[in-house]
């Protein structure tokens, strides 16, 4: 598909919001010695790296990979866990870090899986949220930006494995 990418949220806006989220998360977990950031790969890795630096607490990082997209622009209901956590989260404060919440299906499944492992708490932080697309209600504690139902890329979010490196959030605009 031929397309262009238009800036939707600037690099400066993204970085300012990540710093704000870092402050909020730091306040919430002040005194916790067991905060584990769980990044959902691949899309969250850029956001997670920036957020990890913005959180002024000692914390661990771990990653999971789940897939519901493939190389299309549409989310499917089929959620597959491709990589699980390396470490045990029992008794720990878990912060799931997501790039974008669309239908909520993937995140809901991951939240269910992690809940069975008996963490002390589970919170969710996402860079982008598309509330109009939600099929499953998932409690989201920290939202960078609520956006309309547009296909977006940048700050780790891809289209067919491209554009993850963009420092801004861009809207993919199909060309005829």
From Swiss-Prot:
It comes from Vibrio harveyi (Beneckea harveyi). InterPro entries: HGPRT, Hxn_phspho_trans, PRibTrfase_dom, PRTase-like. Homotetramer. Its EC number is 2.4.2.8. CDD domains: PRTases_typeI. Mg(2+) binds at residues 98-99. GMP binds at residues 98, 102-107, 130, 158. This is Hypoxanthine phosphoribosyltransferase. One of its GO terms (molecular function) is guanine phosphoribosyltransferase activity. The keyword Glycosyltransferase applies. The gene is hpt. Purine salvage pathway enzyme which catalyzes the transfer of the ribosyl-5-phosphate group from 5-phospho-alpha-D-ribose 1-diphosphate (PRPP) to the N9 position of hypoxanthine to yield IMP (inosine 5'-monophosphate). To a lesser extent, can also act on guanine leading to GMP, but shows a highly less efficient activity with xanthine. PROSITE patterns: PUR_PYR_PR_TRANSFER. One of its GO terms (biological process) is IMP salvage. Its main location: cytoplasm. NCBIfam families: HGPRTase. Pathway: Purine metabolism; IMP biosynthesis via salvage pathway; IMP from hypoxanthine: step 1/1. It catalyses: IMP + diphosphate = hypoxanthine + 5-phospho-alpha-D-ribose 1-diphosphate; GMP + diphosphate = guanine + 5-phospho-alpha-D-ribose 1-diphosphate. Its cofactor is Mg(2+). Diphosphate binds at residues 42-43, 164. IMP binds at residues 98, 102-107, 130. Belongs to the purine/pyrimidine phosphoribosyltransferase family. The active site is at 102 (proton acceptor).
